[in-house]
């Protein structure tokens, strides 16, 4: 019996050592296998086989197999003879071949740290909470394992994966990534966002999709309207989870989470996530794995930032100064827009000018973030009048218009995109060079998301921020959150580091003044632009009232920072364009702007007897009392600071770590930048500032046995900035202050029997007095926003908008003749009608069977000969009226005969003529 041929390796990780075992005497060729001859074949040693190799060296066999496997991994070859990439990247994660091809087609060679840490955990069916800085590949980290787990389209009705996004642009971008990685599979993916046709989305959900990418509001609308059953969901992703779990999406997420099955796998991803998962308790995480990468860097190391101190009335001029002198923004239409205009034609194009050509943004592409949509409209109009190519987008803009504006910026048809924070998260725009914060962000994590649009995937980028005096507390909060040094003016020296320091300075005075004057003239000439500016000013007043407040510590420090000399010094970016005379001019202007006269309004211009008036004497005596007291306080502060500095010089290093400033940081742990959250990870700890000038007292803390209520590894400023509930500093929901947190959880047992106490209003329980309408209104309406709006109770018991049950789905179902929607778990119908219900369901194709002959040709028409030819063809083919067959039946029925007789009798009675038979 001939020896069996060698089998090829089953997969990339398997290898064939048959040739080595048999000394390469077998080549595996089936044609020559029967003629194979053995050379120097030794007889089998039965004793050696029966001894089970006890006398042989097992380590030698293991070493031999390891050597063969290493050789196979070093260089393998596929069936075509081409070299295969080494394992260790995506190939080592056990992904299928179609997905690996899609990954390589996308251009991914090596997984990023967040992908390397999370993909194995997700494939192991674990709940994951992942945080990594912007541009690190978080979208692919949950899309790749999702496609690997779903594999193919399910014949059972019901979606299996849900991806929630806070904005429409982010959902659209996620859809593109899913389509790119899903090539080679038959998975169905739908996009459900606001602004699109609701009827079309009914059809999408009726087509039994596998993956649903949606925003919370529209998905809840479809769920309530269509009575969707979400029990088939196995894979749920919350992209930008900290934004989704804020109060704005509380009602929508509560209803959606209630409908999801408990056995689902839940993933949370964002660039800004707190270490504590208490705020995500509603997500239903089950023993999640927390992965926080680059927690200490927060922003890309390739990002360079500059902060400019400006006055409120000069912000528009400062913006033009940055665009023209720093960004070097060209005016007019970009080259891509000109090419698109010149090559416009209705004829379908192929090749390099066809629709497959991918246009890229220009090297001057800049995003400008504004506070409200009114600012966006005003700035977009102002920049267009300045000659720039501008696109704009905000939340309430029509969805089609938003897509057009963002796509124009993506393809390089415009250089500037003016947006609100709707585009601050997740939007990936390639080759984005600059980010400008026209309105300074009120939260540190919003700044992280804004500047994360640039310096992505190893590319360098710049961020410019305009900081008014009122924005200084938010700047200090950001500086504490990032853990960087704050340098004012020329304090940075000759070699400033814009990537690691927060450097604040002023813009060039003459440039800002000239551009501000030009804008003033433009506003004087254009009434429409003036109206837009007035509306933006009113919107800013409301925005300032409703934005989150800064921390009290930063508010106190901000007064000193703004009053310092370096606040209005020229920024180091302009050190090469200024000379000594310009610097002296700036110093003189700073002195003039900070000048405060000694005389009051009662004393200025008073001479002679008027100088000794009663009002002037009162102010003079008061000044004599206040000025020495103020000078004494300043001297005491200076002496206390000097004494504290002398004591610090004699302190040990261990004591210095306990008495650092608020600005100084203590770094503990190793420098592992890719570890899960643990007690030993790298954290930045801000120590409490000691009281200066009051003398040092012995601490009552026992260093060996004292236990603090806060872990040493907690960075207060960082956790406060990462807070989910809007990052607010003035709410008890923020656990940054133990006293505030304790006050928020206290339980009051007064009036527990429901009896009304003395002097309590009769309608005070659950009600409040509305001053505007002069009546009591429910306090619950203030919490959920249902002021004058009709609400219904959802399945979870929460109030949702009554407009979600408008009956539009029932009308759509009747219009498309869908008897009923298939239930979750039922088998999908085969054929074209599988998209709808039973019988003549949605998606059924109808074939027209009626045949009509062409009309007779008209000799006065231009196409007479063509029509004549068509008529001849119809006669030849016997189509329509020219078709052969039995003629019309002329046999009358009894009813026809009866009708004819009645008609004849009626005519006879009418004419009254005798019959011809009467003549004879």
Curated annotation (Swiss-Prot):
Listed Basic residues bias regions: 904-920
Intrachain S-S bonds: none
Q: Which InterPro entries match?
A: DBP10_C (IPR012541), DDX54/DBP10_DEAD-box_helicase (IPR033517), DEAD/DEAH_box_helicase_dom (IPR011545), DEAD_box_RNA_helicase (IPR050079), Helicase_ATP-bd (IPR014001), Helicase_C-like (IPR001650), P-loop_NTPase (IPR027417), RNA-helicase_DEAD-box_CS (IPR000629)
Give GO terms: molecular function aspect only: ATP binding; ATP hydrolysis activity; RNA binding; RNA helicase activity
Task: Report motif location: DEAD box.
Answer: 239-242
Residue ranges of the region described as Disordered: 337-361, 623-668, 749-770, 813-920
Q: Does the keyword Cytoplasm apply?
A: no
Motif Q motif extends across 88-116
* Keywords attached to this entry: ATP-binding, Helicase, Hydrolase, Nucleotide-binding, Nucleus, Ribosome biogenesis, RNA-binding, rRNA processing
Q: Where is the Helicase C-terminal domain?
A: 339-503
Q: What Enzyme Commission number(s) appear in the record?
A: 3.6.4.13
Q: Where is the composition biased (Basic and acidic residues)?
A: 351-361, 623-638, 813-831, 851-878, 885-903
Q: Tell me the ranges covered by the Helicase ATP-binding domain, including all copies.
A: 119-291
Q: Which GO terms describe its cellular component?
A: nucleolus
| Compartment(s) of residence | Nucleus, Nucleolus
Biological-process GO terms, alphabetical: rRNA processing
Q: In which residue ranges is the amino acid composition biased (Acidic residues)?
A: 645-668
Q: Which SMART domains does the UniProt record give?
A: DBP10CT, DEXDc, HELICc
Q: What the protein does?
A: ATP-binding RNA helicase involved in the biogenesis of 60S ribosomal subunits and is required for the normal formation of 25S and 5.8S rRNAs.
Recorded family membership: Belongs to the DEAD box helicase family. DDX54/DBP10 subfamily.
What's the domain remark here?
The Q motif is unique to and characteristic of the DEAD box family of RNA helicases and controls ATP binding and hydrolysis.
For this entry, the protein name equals ATP-dependent RNA helicase dbp10
Q: Which organism is it from?
A: Sclerotinia sclerotiorum (strain ATCC 18683 / 1980 / Ss-1) (White mold)
GN (gene name): dbp10
